[in-house]
Amino acid sequence: MVRTADTVRSMIDLHCHMLPGIDDGAPDLATALAMARIAVADGIHTVACTPHIYPGLYENDAAGIRRAIADFRLALAEAGIELTLVEGADTHMAPDLVQSLKAGRVPTLAGSRYFLYEPPHHVAPPRLEEQVFALLANGYVPVITHPERLTWIESHYALFPRMAKAGAWLQLTAGAITGRFGKRPQYWSQKLMDEGPVHLIASDAHSAGRRSPVISEARERAARQLGEAESWALVRDRPQAILDDLSPDKVLAPPLRGKALGWWARLMSRR
């Protein structure tokens, strides 16, 4: 791909498992450095290091994540890799999540009001919407990660536009948009983008291989579906707004095109 002035080092990836040896992402420093090089080559200048916080499986916390980021920053500098790191976590549902956020045990994205919120992958949780509303009521903006990849999205699809309308944000995975996760996640990512609102695209990278930190191709796909301006909002403008901790009402909202126009757009794109 030949990069223009707009694409060179202009993107922000707010969901990445790059920190070495802390979850199911990069297993070691060599892999983490390889991932960082891939991100830079793709045009990414800032990455949120977002390891899992999953009680009983990945017992990470804000203090440990910050220490890991500090160590990795030193490694990047020694390797001559220019990549800005900010803190975050891929936070799974937990009954005490609001309290953990308030106590600082769970980090938000770069210390903002926004944080990554991961629903269970295989089972629709009965109290998901209730917890999202509680988080919003306490001043947090949950960024719901990869809804397009959840096995239960078909039977609960309306839940996601409803939560987004209430104030939650939705983040799609770049690889789902480009088809790396198969036809089903690609279909749901297209449907969500068609009908809105989708706020962010991120890599959810876990390796330097199939799940690497690459989002440029997904941005190009989004540009064909939504237009250039909105595609850049997904990977640059709204991520920057999160880093700046802007109130959601100060951020350009994603377009709400509705079902009819969305399906018409998809029909026309196949011609």
Locate predicted features.
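An N-terminally biased module of ancient metal coordination in phosphate/nucleic-acid-related enzymes
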Residues: 1-80
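Mid-to-C-terminal alpha-helical segments outside catalytic/metal-binding sites
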Residues: 220-271
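Active-site gating loops and adjacent loop-to-helix segments of metal-dependent hydrolytic enzymes
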Residues: 4-10, 48-50, 102-112, 167, ...
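Non-catalytic positions within long, well-ordered alpha-helices that form the structural scaffold/packing
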Residues: 40, 136, 193-194
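Short acidic/histidine-rich active-site segments
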Residues: 197-213
